[in-house]
């Protein structure tokens, strides 16, 4: 259907539209008109992706000079594939309506691991190994050697792409990862570099967060993208953690020992080259005097190690004299390594700021701040000069150099914590240095400054106002949308007591209480008797899940649950969890029914949708607070309090509630789906917790369902499931939660749509 969204003609590839989709498009258009940033919370399963794509594509066509590109960032490969399929549907609808092929290019980009087609590289399991092997086949000096001697190993796909692929752009159309690989095999071109080259002239690019937020990768991949692009971060409720992880470095004793070995290898290589080819080292010295920008004007294949965060002015400077020659630089790294090793020999926890660390470094081993800033780039230049083909071996030393560059670049927003042992095993010495980023805005700031519109969107962003604070930006639109339903298909409830009236909670004091554990077991047992097909239960941590399940086993509760449904458990091993998920789905398909016990913040809670019968009930055992004794977390809370005036308790509750909402939101993946959302902890009933749930869940959480016993909860569930079992046809939704074009244009509907979005 063709829609008129605030004067913009939008092609929508379906015959019907949800009211919230139209409302969402209106907000999006306002954001794009204002050329600003937006934060939008849209209920899960209401067609967020297609609304985004349809509106932004229409905007691109109407104002080609205003918006040149859409950069769509998603978290996992399956999500990226989903977005590409929606885009394909949308483009074919456009072509059907217009009767001609559009000059439109949309593509997905992922790591070499998902795109490489070289027979020697594809069998490797880990991304790091794939990148290293790729570099050893495509580095410019490896290719130069191949030109001289064609018997040497090389990558024929890259050579072919380099000769022909750059002249012939990708034909217009939509490409997912498999399509790119198919083109690569057909033409004999490397799909990874083809995709990286093509994103410059694509209309829509879909890739992972890291390509924009991790400075080491963004510098290589996204540097050339134009300012007039719209960036969308989908499923962005965790975006602050992604930003923080991309800027933090952990150094253990094992890493430092491997650094030592790396340095010795480099020392030998330098001596060998000095004897055979001294000209090469002189050439590098000359380049470094001219400035790093010249030194790093290397080819795309060599840019395997990007610098973590160097501002432009540093790249234009000459490298300090003290680290220009290879021997001096290696001596410099050795002194730095010895100092960090010495710091790890502490007997108690140390916390200090980067300037304090630097002053200690200057006093002890006479290392100044300036050469440290060049460390990462200088190492990159050295590895390039020495023609080191297997870069993965040097990742420990690269990590140390990145740490040196970061610690000398940022005086604020970071802390250094040195722990002599893990709190959980205080008798085992296991020292670790955390260089921890506390300010999420540091990684995302360049994105906000560079692109004219950045949209942060997800099903669980409540409370909205905290995101602009912790990411330090000023949105032009902030809105949360409700879910218009012809029948109420979600049933949230808070179970706060067992049948014996004992308050149930996962808080630390009552965690080991046998009565609480028994009541949790009874809740699962009774729910498994009334809920059809699949139940997903989330615990607050792996440790808590293990101790609870062990206790249920001793009390015989597990045996009773097994009579109703089969049990599957998520573990920390990814492969094991995948098998458990597969079997869980099989049990639901076969009508045996299944329960999946998993962990908030784990793999299951983030990326897996339990559509229809795979998730008829989600039970959240406890409030999923993060481990509050962690020193890194304490330092971050202190920073948030001092810099952004966010109280510790507010942030912890916000963090717990967004994860709880993310977990229970897995059950509802569309308006024809239905499910129970059980919050099993009396603390959820408090106003400060309840008020931080997304608006679309809060609306259906009635006062009657706030502090139920297990029995009462089961009665509510029975009644709800009986209602849901009644036949439900598309006709029942028409005019209410599903609109045709005529209905959408009526004044009454438009008035209703205005109430869906709640602006903040």
From Swiss-Prot:
Molecular functions per Gene Ontology = 4 iron, 4 sulfur cluster binding; 5'-3' DNA helicase activity; ATP binding; ATP hydrolysis activity; damaged DNA binding; DNA helicase activity; metal ion binding
Against PANTHER family, the record matches this protein to: DNA REPAIR DEAD HELICASE RAD3/XP-D SUBFAMILY MEMBER (PTHR11472), GENERAL TRANSCRIPTION AND DNA REPAIR FACTOR IIH HELICASE SUBUNIT XPD (PTHR11472:SF1)
The species this protein belongs to is: Bos taurus
The PTM entry states: ISGylated.
List, separated by semicolons, the cofactors it needs. Answer: Mg(2+); [4Fe-4S] cluster
Its biological purpose? ATP-dependent 5'-3' DNA helicase, component of the general transcription and DNA repair factor IIH (TFIIH) core complex, which is involved in general and transcription-coupled nucleotide excision repair (NER) of damaged DNA and, when complexed to CDK-activating kinase (CAK), involved in transcription by RNA polymerase II. In NER, TFIIH acts by opening DNA around the lesion to allow the excision of the damaged oligonucleotide and its replacement by a new DNA fragment. The ATP-dependent helicase activity of XPD/ERCC2 is required for DNA opening.
Any one Gene Ontology cellular component term annotated for this protein? nucleus
The places in or outside the cell where this protein is found are: Nucleus; Cytoplasm, Cytoskeleton, Spindle
Asked if the keyword Membrane belongs to this entry, the reply reads no
Q: Recite the UniProt cofactor note for this protein.
A: Binds 1 [4Fe-4S] cluster.
Identify the main location: nucleus
Q: Enumerate the residues binding [4Fe-4S] cluster.
A: 116, 134, 155, 190
- Motif annotated as DEAH box, chain positions: 234-237
Q: Subunit arrangement?
A: Component of the 7-subunit TFIIH core complex composed of XPB/ERCC3, XPD/ERCC2, GTF2H1, GTF2H2, GTF2H3, GTF2H4 and GTF2H5, which is active in NER. The core complex associates with the 3-subunit CDK-activating kinase (CAK) module composed of CCNH/cyclin H, CDK7 and MNAT1 to form the 10-subunit holoenzyme (holo-TFIIH) active in transcription. The interaction with GTF2H2 results in the stimulation of the 5'-->3' helicase activity. Component of the MMXD complex, which includes CIAO1, ERCC2, CIAO2B, MMS19 and SLC25A5. Interacts with CIAO1 and CIAO2B; the interaction WITH CIAO2B is direct.
What reactions does this protein catalyze?
Couples ATP hydrolysis with the unwinding of duplex DNA at the replication fork by translocating in the 5'-3' direction. This creates two antiparallel DNA single strands (ssDNA). The leading ssDNA polymer is the template for DNA polymerase III holoenzyme which synthesizes a continuous strand; ATP + H2O = ADP + phosphate + H(+)
What protein is this chain from? Answer: General transcription and DNA repair factor IIH helicase subunit XPD
Query: Which intervals hold domain Helicase ATP-binding?
Result: 7-283
Q: Some GO term, biological process aspect, for this entry: which one?
A: transcription by RNA polymerase II
Family statement drawn from the similarity comment of this UniProt entry:
Belongs to the helicase family. RAD3/XPD subfamily.
């Amino acid at each position: 259907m063709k829609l008129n969204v605030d004067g913009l003609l939008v092609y929508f590839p379906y015959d019907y539209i949800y009211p919230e989709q139209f409302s969402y498009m209106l907000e999006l258009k306002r954001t794009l008109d204002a050329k600003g940033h937006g934060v939008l919370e849209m209920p899960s399963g209401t067609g967020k992706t297609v609304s985004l794509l349809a509106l932004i594509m229409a905007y691109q066509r109407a104002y080609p000079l205003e918006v040149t590109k859409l950069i769509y960032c998603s978290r996992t490969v399956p999500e990226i594939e989903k977005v590409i399929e929606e885009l394909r549907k949308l483009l074919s609808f456009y072509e059907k309506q217009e009767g001609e092929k559009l000059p439109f290019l949309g593509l997905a980009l992922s790591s070499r691991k998902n795109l490489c087609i070289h027979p020697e590289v594809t069998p490797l399991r880990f991304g790091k190994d794939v990148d290293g092997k790729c570099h050893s086949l495509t580095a410019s000096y490896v290719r130069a050697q191949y030109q001289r001697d064609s018997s040497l190993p090389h990558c024929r796909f890259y050579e072919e792409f380099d000769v022909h692929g750059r002249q012939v752009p990708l034909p217009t159309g939509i490409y997912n990862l498999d399509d790119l690989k198919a083109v690569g095999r057909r033409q004999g071109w490397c799909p990874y570099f083809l995709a990286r080259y093509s994103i410059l002239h694509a209309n829509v690019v879909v890739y992972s967060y890291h390509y924009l937020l991790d400075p080491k990768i963004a510098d290589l991949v996204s540097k050339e993208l134009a300012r007039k692009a719209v960036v969308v971060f989908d499923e962005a409720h965790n975006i602050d953690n992604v930003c923080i992880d991309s800027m933090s470095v952990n150094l253990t004793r094992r890493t430092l020992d491997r650094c030592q070995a790396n340095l010795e290898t480099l020392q030998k290589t330098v001596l060998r080259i000095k004897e055979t080819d001294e000209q090469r080292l002189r050439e590098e010295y000359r380049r470094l005097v001219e400035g790093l920008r010249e030194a790093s004007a290397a080819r795309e294949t060599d840019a395997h190690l990007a610098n973590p965060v160097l501002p432009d002015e540093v790249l234009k400077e000459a490298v300090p004299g003290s680290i220009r020659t290879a021997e001096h630089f290696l001596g410099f790294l050795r002194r730095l390594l010895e100092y960090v090793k010495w710091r790890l020999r502490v007997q108690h926890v140390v916390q200090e700021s980067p300037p304090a660390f630097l002053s200690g470094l200057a006093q002890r081993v006479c290392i100044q701040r300036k050469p440290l800033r060049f460390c990462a780039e200088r190492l990159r230049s050295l590895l390039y000069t020495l023609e080191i083909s297997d870069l993965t071996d040097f990742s420990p030393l690269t990590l140390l150099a990145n740490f040196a560059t970061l610690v000398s670049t940022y005086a604020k927003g970071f802390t250094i914590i040195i722990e002599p042992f893990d709190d959980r095993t205080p008798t085992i010495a296991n020292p670790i240095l955390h260089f921890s980023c506390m300010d999420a805005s540091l990684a995302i700031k360049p994105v906000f400054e560079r692109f004219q519109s950045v949209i942060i969107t997800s099903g669980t962003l409540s409370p909205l106002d905290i995101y602009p604070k912790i990411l330090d930006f000023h949105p032009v639109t902030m809105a949360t949308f409700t879910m218009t339903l012809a029948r109420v298909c979600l049933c949230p409830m808070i179970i706060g007591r067992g049948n014996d009236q004992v308050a149930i909670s996962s808080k630390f004091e009552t965690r080991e209480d046998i009565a609480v554990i028994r009541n949790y077991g009874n809740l699962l047992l009774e729910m498994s008797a009334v809920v059809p097909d699949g139940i997903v239960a989330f615990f607050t941590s792996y440790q808590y899940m293990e101790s609870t399940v062990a206790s249920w086993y001793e009390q015989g509760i597990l045996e009773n649950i097994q009579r109703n449904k089969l049990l599957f458990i998520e573990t920390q091993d990814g492969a094991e969890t995948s098998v458990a998920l597969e079997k869980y789905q099989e049990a639901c398909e076969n009508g045996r029914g299944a329960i999946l016990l998993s962990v908030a913040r784990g793999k299951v809670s983030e990326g897996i949708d339990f559509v229809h019968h795979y998730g008829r009930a989600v039970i959240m055992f406890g409030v999923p607070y993060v481990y509050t004794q962690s020193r890194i977390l304490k330092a971050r809370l202190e920073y948030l309090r001092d810099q952004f005036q966010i109280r510790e308790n507010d942030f912890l509750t916000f963090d717990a509630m967004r994860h709880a909402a993310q977990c229970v939101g897995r059950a509802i993946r569309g308006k024809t789906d239905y499910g129970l959302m059980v919050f099993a902890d009396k603390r959820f009933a408090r106003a400060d917790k309840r008020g931080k749930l997304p608006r679309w869940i809060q609306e259906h959480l009635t006062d009657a369902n706030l502090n139920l016993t297990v029995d009462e909860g089961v009665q509510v569930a029975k009644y709800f499931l009986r209602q849901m079992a009644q036949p439900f046809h598309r006709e029942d939704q028409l005019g209410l939660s599903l609109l045709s074009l005529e209905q959408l244009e009526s004044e009454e509907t438009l008035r209703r749509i205005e109430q869906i979005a709640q602006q903040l």
